[in-house]
């Protein structure tokens, strides 16, 4: 199997792996993608689809190349966007035949091989008034699955837009007639549907709208500022990830990943630095590493930092934050942490390698005597006793006592002038 180790976004550079729909299947990330076949062209040429997987979001393995010849389509240049789902131990692959039809294939493994489930389109362009392409599949909390598809009225004419329908348990037929989604925005194609904090998020090209019902109506909120093309979201290891399109060229695109944070008002926030450099690895030369950029979080929640800006990572019991592949550590001599401690005392352990790895240092925190929330913010630091390897996983083990909320804001590594000698 082909493997690629990414240094930054895009995660699979120079290969035309685009229109990413990302899923957490069996505690592993799977990227279901279209494939721009030819660089330096002035139109889309897409001969197949690709499925990539990763256990750390940095090292990616090509699971399979899916060819339209294996389905009802036959040879094609129009292998447009795809999505996938898991139900009852089987995996379902929904694919676009250009902007005209949608098919479905099934496999016993998330990486395939996939077999055409119907031998004909699931949507042949006649069931609704919209253009039936760009499928997005969504699993709700009650175990029901829905398919969203369609292109915008401003492009394809009256009656077009997003449509949604609940799927039967077989995942290859509809349990109801697709209905049009009401959206107070112009919309697009390239839909994705997720649920965060009890709200349904319909997203498209970085834009997103929110509803209390899976069927809508959806109220436009804003843009993630991470991409203007296909994207999708998934939750994994206590973190929210967005798979984004990175435009290396207009018709030869790539895919990247970034973290996503949700404000109290429902806005989705991304970080420009992470949009550029990607997830799962960090540079100790950065001025600060935000706590919410963790790759894995146990017993934590993100909350808005009302005193300053951005987000905090909060816990009220033992918690663990993991920041793997921290680079350029060999010339660093110390560690500095910004945090809040409210209600009592806490201990923050900084370790390498894992939760039980070597201890770099420890910070003892306690609720300050100041009466204003602003002054609950503290900074503390310590010097390393040993020289660090140049690349290492760094883990924060948080131990608040009962009745204490510990919030981590950010941290950075110290490089003293003497280390340059």
Describe the predicted segments one by one.
Residues 1-421:
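Carbohydrate-active catalytic/glycan-binding domains of CAZyme proteins
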């Amino acid at each position: 199997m082909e493997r690629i180790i990414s240094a930054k976004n895009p995660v699979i550079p120079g290969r035309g792996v685009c229109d990413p729909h990302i899923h957490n299947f069996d505690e592993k990330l799977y990227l279901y993608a279209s494939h721009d076949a030819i660089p330096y062209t002035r139109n889309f040429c897409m001969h197949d689809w690709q499925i990539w997987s990763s256990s750390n979001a940095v090292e990616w393995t090509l699971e399979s190349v899916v060819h339209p010849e294996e389905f009802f389509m036959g040879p094609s240049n129009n292998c447009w966007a795809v999505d996938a789902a898991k139900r009852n131990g089987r995996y379902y692959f929904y694919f676009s035949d250009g902007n005209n039809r949608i098919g479905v294939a099934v496999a016993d493994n998330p990486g395939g091989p996939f077999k055409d489930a119907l031998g004909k389109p699931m949507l042949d362009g006649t069931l609704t008034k919209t253009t039936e392409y760009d499928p997005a599949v969504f699993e709700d909390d009650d175990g029901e699955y829905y398919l969203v598809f369609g292109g915008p009225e401003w492009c394809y004419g009256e009656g077009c837009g997003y449509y949604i329908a609940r799927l039967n348990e077989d995942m290859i037929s509809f349990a109801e007639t697709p209905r049009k989604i009401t959206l107070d925005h112009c919309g697009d194609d390239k839909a994705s549907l997720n649920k965060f904090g009890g709200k349904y998020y319909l997203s498209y090209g970085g834009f997103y709208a929110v509803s209390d019902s899976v069927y809508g109506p959806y109220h436009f909120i804003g843009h993630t500022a991470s991409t203007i093309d296909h994207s999708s979201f998934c939750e994994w290891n206590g973190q929210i990830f967005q798979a984004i399109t990175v435009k290396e060229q207009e018709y030869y695109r790539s895919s990247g990943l970034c973290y996503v944070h949700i404000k109290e008002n429902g806005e989705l926030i991304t970080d420009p630095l992470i949009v550029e450099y990607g997830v799962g690895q960090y540079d100790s030369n950065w001025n600060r590493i935000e706590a919410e950029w963790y790759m894995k979080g146990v017993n934590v929640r993100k909350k808005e930092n009302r005193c300053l800006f951005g987000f905090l990572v909060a816990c009220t019991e033992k918690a663990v934050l993991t920041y793997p592949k921290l680079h350029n550590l060999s010339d660093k001599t110390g560690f500095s942490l910004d945090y809040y401690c409210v209600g009592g005392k806490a201990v923050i352990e900084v370790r390498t390698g894992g939760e039980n790895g070597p201890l770099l240092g420890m910070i003892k925190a306690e609720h300050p005597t100041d009466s204003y929330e602003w002054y609950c913010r503290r900074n503390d630091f310590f010097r390393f006793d040993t020289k660090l390897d140049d690349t290492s996983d760094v883990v924060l083990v948080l131990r608040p006592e009962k009745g204490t909320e510990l919030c981590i804001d950010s941290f950075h590594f110290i490089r003293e002038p003497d280390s340059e000698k």
